[in-house]
From Swiss-Prot:
Record field: compositional bias (Basic and acidic residues): 178-197
Higher taxonomy: Eukaryota, Metazoa, Chordata, Craniata, Vertebrata
Secretion signal span: none
Annotated InterPro entries: DUF4562
Region Disordered, residue ranges: 161-197
Protein name: Protein SPMIP2
Source superkingdom: Eukaryota
Length: 197
């Protein structure tokens, strides 16, 4: 019969539940307060400055537990595992896990505009179509090509803008200003200069 031996665990944390863990779950995490953190120098520092760094290494108040378990936070370890779906159900239904910030929206725009032409029709056509015509995504040039063969609303607008306007509806031409006559370099003798008197 084989002999079963029992040995003490290598670490004191083996086989026990860890509440506060350090990096990589190596051991229980306990805050360490550094000694002698006050400022020592030649002159006394200004009153609004502080050299006391004890507040940086202060432990958590009453050693309180974290508010939620890690799998409850979106994107944390264990999040989205089917066994823990009951935790994340409301967040999945509301789309909370998908966040479009400034840079991700810019990346989406760059990808969606890659195979689109940035061509846009004349501003007069865009004005005729209304405020929604100046949209976010570029226009499709195919809607405006071969306008004689298409009957879409946009093609009709383009044809109308290209057609010559009748004389009565054209804006009137402004009269040209008369050219200024060149002044002679010499003044007549009978005119008196007011600066002399």
């Amino acid at each position: 019969m084989a002999c079963v031996t029992f040995r003490e665990p290598i670490s004191a944390t083996v086989g026990k539940r860890m509440v506060f863990t350090g990096p990589a779950y190596v051991k229980d995490h306990l805050p360490q307060v550094a000694q002698h953190t006050a400022y020592i120098g030649e002159k006394r520092p200004a009153l609004e400055k502080t050299g006391d760094l004890r507040y940086l290494w202060r432990p958590a108040s009453n050693r309180s537990l974290p508010a939620k378990y890690k799998p409850e936070y979106v994107g944390e370890i264990g999040w989205g595992i089917p066994e823990y779906d009951f935790i994340n159900k409301t967040r999945l239904q509301t789309g909370f896990h998908i966040k479009y910030e400034e840079f991700s929206q810019a990346a989406i725009d760059k990808l969606s505009h890659r195979y689109q032409s940035p061509w846009q029709p004349n501003p007069s056509i865009m004005d005729a179509e209304g405020s929604s015509s100046r949209g976010f995504i570029a226009w499709h040039m195919g809607d405006y090509e071969d306008t004689s063969q298409r009957n879409s609303k946009r093609a009709v607008l383009l044809r109308q803008s290209k057609a010559a306007l009748p004389i009565g509806s054209r804006p009137p031409k402004l009269p040209k200003l008369p050219k200024k006559e060149e002044k002679s370099k010499f003044r007549p003798l009978h005119q008196h200069d007011a600066r002399c008197y």
